[in-house]
Amino acid sequence: MGYRQLIDWKAFYAEEAEIELLNDPEEAAARERLLEEISAKVIDYNAHINEYNLAQHCREIQARGLVFKPISKRTALRKWDAFFASELTAETKREICYSSFKWHMFSYEKVAARKGSDAKRAFNRCRKGAAYLFIQCTDEAWYIENAQLLTAADLGVDYSFERADVYIFDAKGKWAYARTHESDCGPYFLRKP
């Protein structure tokens, strides 16, 4: 399960390029209209399937006993910044586009962290109690009472680009884990001394 693509978009865009070469404007307009309808339906279908899969995934996690309490994302962001980014200057944050992607603090090596499979192992092995979780490109954030039941695999599923950058961190700021939308960046794990 995870984020799915139902259509070969490369072939779709090649078809669009072919339409531009047509000498018959009426036929070109008809094909463009049909392609737009196909595109809209496929996007709607993918969104439906991905939302369903996400809901199923959340139910599976909650069935294991995890308790997610919705909180203000602003609260989670303030805590993240205080715990993990307080050493970064405003200039550094601008340079690395920190406000758009908090994980850039790790990828630009402004804050040392484990990465890749090493980060996943470290996250799975660390002692977890209460934690905060937020998603970069949405307004979603939660307080998790029993994060010890959560694994890197639980956080490693893409259901959409908007939900791809996931951050979870200890409620006392002892550790942090960031899963990114970039397949060659991260995930990252930071444990404070």
Residue positions per predicted region:
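Structured alpha/beta or helical-core interaction and ligand-binding surfaces enriched in interleaved
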Residues: M1-P193
